[in-house]
Design a protein with these regions (language model features):
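Phosphate-end processing signature that detects enzymes handling 5′-triphosphorylated RNA
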Residues: 1-179
Length: 179
């Protein structure tokens, strides 16, 4: 189990985009409901995703991310402040390809990696599809009170606001498709 401490911000993309000068990866994230953990097996839709002997409790969000040829299963707990429980497992591509993912809440984005003047790595997500134009930046921290040099292209801080997680955005997209 890990602990994720991060701050998230809207990005003002009308001006220079220095984050585009570095490395990036394309990602598709699918959000799962009805995931169970029984006898050391994490199951969804009667398909075994992974094996995990550790007790998994108080997890609220399950996600499968495809980035290049890497598939990652992630489970997160409820966020308190800037902190949440965070589990990550590599998943075989064969399992990913066998999953019925069509119709699931999903987001597609290009993630840029940009190093700030304080040496911290920023992940800047430029969303695709129906929320194209939305840009959110996040930075992982060692503690909630860690000092951060905030780039001048940041806008509103989203860290403590509900409705701006990737899971929430995926549900918003899904809801809009149904209307």
């Amino acid at each position: 189990m890990g602990i994720e401490i991060e701050r998230r911000f809207l990005v003002d993309g009308r001006y220079d985009k220095p984050w585009r000068s570095g490395n990036y990866s394309e990602m598709c994230q699918h959000y799962l409901s009805g995931v169970s953990h029984i006898d050391g097996k994490v199951m969804w839709n009667e398909i075994q995703l992974i094996e995990e002997e550790e007790v998994l409790e108080n997890l609220t969000t399950w996600r499968i991310r495809l980035s290049g040829d890497t598939v990652t299963l992630t489970a997160k707990g409820r966020r308190v402040g800037a902190t949440a429980t965070d589990y990550n497992w590599d998943m075989p591509m064969e399992i990913y390809n066998s999953l019925p993912l069509d119709g699931l809440p999903s987001v597609e984005k290009i993630r840029h990696y940009w190093t700030g003047e304080d040496g911290l790595l920023w992940e800047v997500d430029e969303y695709e599809g129906s929320i194209s134009g939305l840009i959110i930046a996040e930075v992982e921290l060692e503690s909630e009170d860690q000092e951060v040099a905030l780039p001048n292209w940041l806008g509103l801080e989203l860290t403590h606001l509900k409705g701006w997680s990737n899971a929430s955005l995926s549900m918003m997209i899904k809801d809009s498709e149904l209307n």
